UniProtKB/Swiss-Prot annotation:
Record's signal peptide: 1-17
Pfam family, any one: Hemagglutinin
Impact upon substituting residue 561 to Y: 60% of proteins are targeted to the basolateral membrane in polarized epithelial cells
HAMAP family, alphabetized: INFV_HEMA (MF_04072)
Assigned keywords, A-Z: Clathrin- and caveolin-independent endocytosis of virus by host, Clathrin-mediated endocytosis of virus by host, Disulfide bond, Fusion of virus membrane with host endosomal membrane, Fusion of virus membrane with host membrane, Glycoprotein, Hemagglutinin, Host cell membrane, Host membrane, Host-virus interaction, Lipoprotein, Membrane, Palmitate, Signal, Transmembrane, Transmembrane helix, Viral attachment to host cell, Viral envelope protein, Viral penetration into host cytoplasm, Virion, Virus endocytosis by host, Virus entry into host cell
Leftover remarks: Major glycoprotein, comprises over 80% of the envelope proteins present in virus particle.
Name used for this protein in its record: Hemagglutinin
Annotated GO CC locations: host cell plasma membrane; membrane; viral envelope; virion membrane
């Protein structure tokens, strides 16, 4: 009975002690992040760095509408295909939109020379002025300028390009022509023209009365002489003949001279260009809506300040960098491991060793105390604020460094440049892989550092308490300390703010420590006596049992006993 009382007394003394635990915040967040060493680490807070949403719409870019080519493409718009008349008034735009299967390009069959380079030039143009470079009525007095073709029909009638003139003989002659234009627009001027290649000598004579015709075009930066290639060809768009289309950019103050004895498709209108670095050309089936954005992709517009996106590599405006990642999330909080909180006889709660506290909501790190006046949480505001400031600055720095927003347009290649296009794709893929790898590695490293940083802060807080309490309390192995003295709320606050008075509680702690140690020693002595008694009693019972069995077996003849003297 005495032993039982001593054990209960010891249990009461041990459990009734005042305690203080060091812990960290936990919540019901479902956020997870990856680190260098772990995947899907549950955390209390994190920020997403990867935009994966768009609205599926074409929008105005910073309030400026795009130029929608509709059923026309760049060729049809610039040459002036009669089916593209609605585009003639176009003056300015934020970007240009083509559809994947635009029908109306060059209505008369032929090749547009260096077309891909022209598209590249137009991708940086945000406005133009269409003007009459060679007035129709006065520029070609000795030639007929009303050439039309069924291939460029409009409303059921033969027609021709709105920006070019098909010059043919006047009467029976095609006298040599010479005409020039001086660029006085103060900006680059896009000049377009063509050369007709008949299918036979008879057609050549019929149109130009000159079997040895040529076309010459010259400026400071351009100088070419063309001769018609007369040959039989398969019929395309009801035509055996072909027209090749050419262009050049005329610098301010420069002069362009046209000279021909036949076959010239002369410029009628030209374009003075104004460049804008955020412009571009996209190919998209998305429809236009009344909306505004600062970043447009062929899939839809993006309104995001995040540094990365995985929606589309082609972007126009202030856009996040495209990467192939599916997840880029940076941790800003702590590991989220809510402890299994239970209330025992005295309402005990564990410290950081057994997980975080959902009950502490006003800080990242802090304390839980328990004494005669009750229990409660208190955040350590200083360490929490320092951590928040450090992590916020780090996240902002990462976003600022990686958030170089820009336009990324596709490069143009013609059908004869497939090897170059394939090589370019491989190079672009290589750069994209590097960007993706760098972005993912950066996030993984920073996540690892942040979580280690939090672990260190909790450990420092624990060491701070330990260095104050010394032997006035004992570590009980779960992030908590058990006082050897009574510690009221004022005492607890002094531990938290670093002003704990160790000498004040030393004597009481010493007495209680000795008392607990004495109870432990006495209970150990009682346990030893009980153990010896139990062993002896068990042995006697065993011997008596063996004797009884032997006597029974001897009496019924199952066992014979012989005693030899």
């Amino acid at each position: 009975m005495k032993a039982k009382l001593l054990v209960l007394l010891y249990a009461f003394v041990a459990t009734d002690a005042d305690t203080i635990c060091i812990g960290y915040h936990a919540n019901n967040s479902t956020d997870t992040v990856d680190t260098i060493f772990e995947k899907n680490v549950a955390v209390t807070h994190s920020v997403n760095l990867l935009e994966d949403r768009h609205n599926g719409k074409l929008c105005k870019l910073k309030g400026i509408a795009p130029l929608q080519l509709g059923k026309c493409n760049i060729t049809g718009w610039l040459l002036g295909n009669p089916e593209c008349d609605s585009l003639l008034p176009a003056r300015s735009w934020s970007y240009i939109v083509e559809t994947p299967n635009s029908e109306n390009g060059a209505c008369y069959p032929g090749d547009f020379i260096d077309y891909e380079e022209l598209r590249e030039q137009l991708s940086s143009v945000s406005s133009l002025e269409r003007f009459e470079i060679f007035p129709k009525e006065s520029s070609w007095p000795n030639h007929t300028f009303n050439g039309v073709t069924v291939s460029c029909s409009h409303r059921g009638k033969s027609s021709f390009y709105r920006n070019l003139l098909w010059l043919t003989k006047k009467g029976d002659s095609y006298p040599k022509l010479t005409n020039s234009y001086v660029n006085n627009k103060g900006k680059e001027v896009l000049v377009l023209w063509g050369v007709h290649h008949p299918s036979s000598s008879d057609e050549q004579q019929s149109l130009y009365s000159n079997g040895n015709a040529y076309v010459s075009v010259a400026s400071s930066n351009y100088n070419r002489r063309f001769t018609p290639e007369i040959a039989a060809r398969p019929k395309v768009k009801d035509q055996h003949g072909r027209m090749n289309y050419y262009w050049t950019l005329l610098e301010p103050g420069d002069t362009i001279i046209f000279e021909a004895t036949g076959n010239l498709i002369a410029p009628w209108y030209a374009f003075a260009l104004s460049r804008g670095f955020e412009s571009g050309i996209i190919t998209s089936n998305a429809s236009m809506h009344e909306c505004n954005t600062k970043c447009q992709t062929p899939q839809g517009s993006i309104n995001s300040n995040l540094p990365f996106q995985n929606i589309h590599p082609v972007t126009i405006g202030e856009c996040p960098k495209y990467v192939r990642s599916t997840k880029l999330r940076m941790v800003t909080g702590l590991r989220n491991i809510p402890s299994i909180q239970y209330r025992g006889l005295f309402g005990a709660i564990a410290g950081f060793i057994e997980g975080g506290w959902t009950g502490m909501i006003d800080g990242w790190y802090g304390y839980h105390h328990q004494n005669e006046q009750g229990s409660g949480y208190a955040a350590d505001q200083k360490s929490t604020q320092n951590a928040i400031n450090g992590i916020t600055n780090k996240v902002n720095s990462v976003i600022e460094k990686m958030n170089t927003q820009f336009t990324a347009v596709g490069k143009e290649f013609n059908n004869l440049e497939k090897r170059m296009e394939n090589l370019n794709k491989k190079v672009d893929d290589g750069f994209l892989d590097i960007w993706t790898y760098n972005a993912e590695l950066l996030v993984l490293l920073e996540n690892e550092r942040t979580l280690d940083f939090h672990d260190l802060n909790v450990k420092n807080l624990y060491e701070k308490v330990k260095s104050q309490l010394k032997n006035n309390a004992k570590e009980i192995g779960n992030g908590c300390f058990e006082f050897y003295h009574k510690c009221d709320n004022e005492c607890m606050e002094s531990v938290r703010n670093g002003t704990y008075d160790y000498p004040k509680y030393s004597e009481e702690s010493k007495l209680n420590r000795e008392k607990i140690d004495g109870v432990k020693l006495e209970s150990m002595g009682v346990y030893q006596i009980l153990a010896i008694y139990s062993t002896v009693a068990s042995s006697l019972v065993l011997l008596v049992s063996l004797g009884a069995i032997s006597f029974w077996m001897c009496s019924n003849g199952s066992l014979q006993c012989r005693i030899c003297i």
